Amino acid sequence: LTRVKELNDNGINVCFAQDSMSDPWYPLGNGNMMMILDHGIHIAQMMSPEEIVNDLDLVTTNGAITMNITDHYGIEEGKPANFIVLDAKSEFEAICERAGIVASVRNGEFLFRKVPAQVTGAIDLLK
């Protein structure tokens, strides 16, 4: 693996991506970028509290910069409303829990919505 942490720390744009989705070269691929992010930040050792809040950029904003599509990427007036909604309250929770997608929006229209998972019972492990 290249020196992702060092490149990122020095202001060089770094992004994570996946080009194989359940094919002969990578049968485990499923297009889940949270899995790719999880692997990448573990291997690159980018898990400090300061890094974690920015790690989502590695699979979102930084990819848009690399692909030179920032003129129509992001949540800003005048740009198409293309985004996903994760089942998490924070960046840390999204990464730690590999948050599921609860909605996907393209050009301002919902492609799908689903009810987030709910825990109906709990065990107090401290007893």
Model-derived regions, located:
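C-terminal cap of metal-dependent C-N hydrolases
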Residues: 77-127
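His/Asp/Glu-enriched, well-ordered alpha-helical/loop segment
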Residues: 2-85
